[in-house]
Structure formats: structure tokens, C-alpha cells
């Protein structure tokens, strides 16, 4: 194993996955629960923050304190969620998920993991990318690279392909949709074009089923289940299960007993949904994938006949409706040799291997998904970097003032494809001052855009006459200062210590309860072989362990000590029982005049039980051309 690993992380809307290079191949890491994916869910329950499967398992009973699909809000200004008495930004919620991923990876690998490559939807804008990077830093990662999800998936796919080819990656996840076209060959992964919809994903198919079920129920009973948070959570889980079942079956039944109650008593929900009905109520959603796919082909200057292979990414691509649409759009059946839930994490691990030196001869050439520029006179959007430009990249353009004696300008940075600046996404703004007074049109102000390999933008403006310059690294309204990140890291670390204490307490309790069960079982099985004194010692040791367990907040050390003493006592049962068996067999053998009694050695009870019980789930420029009015 290399001395340093760079973790590949697919931070998904619905589920997350993580992987690392093992030799020449990327390998998915199983989490603490033994699963290959981790639900992207955080909840607050009884003073604790739960992450992943434990959070998902309690969602029905605790919907108001359960947060899912936070990825859809990454980079949103002033957006927070309440858990317990605290408010959390999307970055902080995502950091909790990443913190669990980091801890589980370290446990799996047996070493610290400080560095990560984290993926984002290809159509994420700069603010969303910066927010993702902030989340990684809050979780304690040194984020080595932000990589587009379809690009990462192509890297996982391309490891087994030697030929040059053009690949279309169709990525429909839980909350976002991306389509990218890449040229693969000679170890180079070059993105030709990308497009997508950041507000379209498997969650929307779930919501369509929820509305279908709720509308039918309301028509029959006059009750809108969507107004009851607990009933809505049950509907949400049932809708997701129905969607999954309808990917392999023609019909499924949704059965929710006691979903609500009236004055007459409890009311149950039981409805059949056919695949035909499901596809009918989601037809508008599948149609929304057509435009971005066709636009990506157009931007790449390709027709569907130029595509050699189609890769499906994201669990939502398992729906037959989606696969049929892709085949119709591209004219060929998609590849099925890439696991849609794992491909992105595997590709991120490959990129991590490239950065760490574990993987040679691979070059990733990604693109910026949207055009970047500034606002100029009249509110127009002046592009400096066009969409689908390979990154990292730099572009400059010279502007001037629009008023006499103008001594400052405002640079407003936008990202998007609309011609009117205000219709695009405002990423940030700053002022350049100290421009010597001069007639309009005289000053020469050079604006330079630089996009790094993570797709994060830096903008600089310099007055060429005076040499005055100002710059900004775009973080948007949701960007975090170093001080904020440090504070959140400290907060995350504090929770990590609490989590570790809870982990130890749970493990100690599990081992104690298992030891008691084993002791009682051994006493019963060996009742005739154990003398009264030893039986009394064992019962006393059991009582000591149980006494600690019965405390409101058992001391971990005390519980571990009592359990160890009980285990030591149990060894005596094995020894005593074994010795008595040997004595009995020796006597029998002596009477028979032979060695036949030796066969009994296979049945010694001393080592039959395992003290390790199963772990329970861990709770763990207005820059005009330039014009100042």
C-alpha cells in the first residue's frame, strides 16, 4: 500500500460512494455498515447527529429533523436548515456526510486519509463548486481536485478500453442531470462538450409517484397526506421503493397501513401502480433530458452516429424508460458494464491515483460548463471564456471607461449563456479604484479570468496606466472565509470526538451483552461439568457486568473492565469442562484397553463461542464598458 492515499468521493444527492486505488485498479470502500453506498442523509435525534443509514432508518419517526438531498441547495445564498437548536448551511450538512466517509475510509484502510478528489455535477456553477470544496475542507480533507461526475465515470470506464473512441456519458442522479461527450484515447480523457439540468433527478420521479398516490388517496378519503410530515415521509420512502421495483417489474403495490386516521378510526393506503402508469406520469421529466443531450452533441459538432459508446451513470438510469430514451436519442444501446452507482467514485479514485503518482499515463482535460464574463454598458454580458473551454485556462480583454474623469469601476462577474447579464448567475463583484482622471475612453483596464483545474474562477482587473490592480476569487454568496472554515472544522472535530465516544460506548455495551449471553449459555451447556465455586464466580461476574450496564450512563472503562473479568472467568469453565471430559475419556479408554477415546477432543466447549457480537448501527463590472451613473 502506498504511504499516502487520495480518496475518490462521489458526494451524491441521494447516496454517496468512495473509492481508492489498490494497485492498478480502483476499489469501492465499504462503509461502517458494510454497504458500498452511504445515504446522503443527516438527522438530529436525542441530542445526536446521525449520518447515513442510521439517519435514513429513523426518518419516518423524525421527519422534521431529517435532512436529505441537501446537494440541491449547495451554493445557495442564505440557505440554512435547522437541526436541534442549531442552523446549518448546505456546506456543513455535506461536511457531516464527508466526515463519516473520511472516518469510514480510515477505518477500512487502517491509515489516516487527508486528501480527496470530490466530484460535482458537470453543470455545477462556480459557486456550487466552491461550496463543495468548502464542505470537504470543513470535514478535514485537503481537496486536491474537484472533478465533473461524467468525466470521472468515463475514467472508470476507460481503464478497460484501449481503443480511441468518442463516448457520451448520460448521468441522471438523485438530484441532477448531466450529459458529457468525451474523446478517449492514448490515456487522454478530453471533454468535448457538456450540458445538463441541475434541478432534475431521481427525486423528481419519486415526487411524481408521491403526487399520484396522494391525489388518489385524497379523492377517495378527502385527506391530503402531503400535509402530514410523517405520512409524507412514509410516502416518500414508498415512492422510492416503487420506482426501484418498477425498474424490474411491470406492476407493484404500495401498501401503507395506518397511514393516517379520522374520527372513524385508522385509514390505510393500498394502491397498485403499473410501469405504464409510472412512465405516463413522468413523461415530462424524461422529455427534459432531450434538450441537454441534443445541445451537447451540437456543441461538440457531432451527430449521434459519431458516438462510439454510451455510458449510463446514476441509479436513476436503471429505469427502463430512461434507457429507452437514451437509445432513441443516440441510436444505440447503452453499455451495461459500468455500475451506475459506483462509476463516479471509481473514476474519482483514478484521478486521485493520477495526482498521487499511483497511476501513470492518464491525462484529464475537462471543460467549464458555462460561459464566464462581466457586465458592460447597457447591462450586457460580455463573455471572456466561452462554455466548453478546456480548463485550466486564462483569458484577458481590455475595457475602458464610459464617463469623463471616472476614477473607479465596478466589475460584476457572471456565469451563464444569456445575453443580458442580470439573467445569468452573479458570481461576485469588486471595485477597481485609483484610476487617474481622464476623458472617457482613455484608460485601458485589462480584465483577466483564470479558471483552475477545479473549475474555480479568479478574476483580476488592472489599470494599465497606473498599475493599480484588484482581484477576486469567486466564492459567491455561499463561499466561506478561511475563518469560517476553521470554525466549522473545529466544530466538526468536536463532534468527531463525541461520535468516537459514542462508538466506544456502543461497542463496549455490545461486547458486554454478548459476554453475558455466552456465559449463561456455557453454564447451561456445562452444568454437570462445572463445580459450584466456579459457577458462583461466573454468576458474580455476570452480575458485575449487568450492574454497569444498568447505569444511566455507563463508564466505558468500567464496562470494558467488567467484561474482561467475565471473559477471564469463562476461560475457567472451558478448562474445567475440558479436564473433566479428558478424565472421563481416559477412564473409558483404560477400561477398553485402547486409544478410542481420543475422538472426543473435537467437542471441547471452551472455545465454542465468539465474544465479538455484531455491531449495531453506529450513530454516528456593474463593470460597464465602463459606465458609472
From Swiss-Prot:
InterPro entries: ATPase_NBD (IPR043129), Chaperone_DnaK (IPR012725), Heat_shock_70_CS (IPR018181), HSP70_C_sf (IPR029048), HSP70_peptide-bd_sf (IPR029047), Hsp_70_fam (IPR013126). Gene3D superfamilies: 1.20.1270.10, 3.30.420.40, Actin, Chain A, domain 4, Substrate Binding Domain Of DNAk, Chain A, domain 1. Residues 611-629 have a biased composition (Acidic residues). One of its GO terms (molecular function) is ATP hydrolysis activity. One of its GO terms (biological process) is chaperone cofactor-dependent protein refolding. Residues 576-587 have a biased composition (Low complexity). Transmembrane segments: none annotated. Pfam families: HSP70 (PF00012). Keywords: ATP-binding, Chaperone, Nucleotide-binding. Disulfide bonds: none annotated. Residues 576-629 are annotated as: Disordered. Residues 588-607 have a biased composition (Gly residues). Belongs to the heat shock protein 70 family. Acts as a chaperone. This is Chaperone protein DnaK.
